[in-house]
Amino acid sequence: MKVTDVKIRKINGESRLRGVASIAFDDCFVVNDIRIIEGEKGIFIAMPSRKTTKGTFRDIAHPVNTETRQVIEESILTKYQDVLNNPVEDKPEQEN
């Protein structure tokens, strides 16, 4: 399985949440809402999760082995650094 697209939405604010990512595999499967979080030991990703009725959180989708997790994390964090280093200027609104 190959990562074919990564999209980052930067989050500005004072929380530890720095961004949200979507990642596509083989141009046919997408995982949305992967959080990019700043922790005490640096930036990491958190897979999408849902709060259970017992108040705990359970991943909706997650890699089943370390190698896949590393590929996902590296792809997202590399793209996140690209977004930080090359900010896209807001396009001015066009008048009609």
Curated annotation (Swiss-Prot):
Family of the protein in this entry: Belongs to the SpoVG family.
InterPro entries in the record: SpoVG, SpoVG_sf
Pfam families named among the record's database cross-references: SpoVG
Primary role: Could be involved in septation.
Alphabetical UniProt keywords: Cell cycle, Cell division, Septation
Identification of the protein by name: Putative septation protein SpoVG
Gene Ontology biological-process annotations: division septum assembly; sporulation resulting in formation of a cellular spore
TM segment ranges: none
Organism domain of life: Bacteria
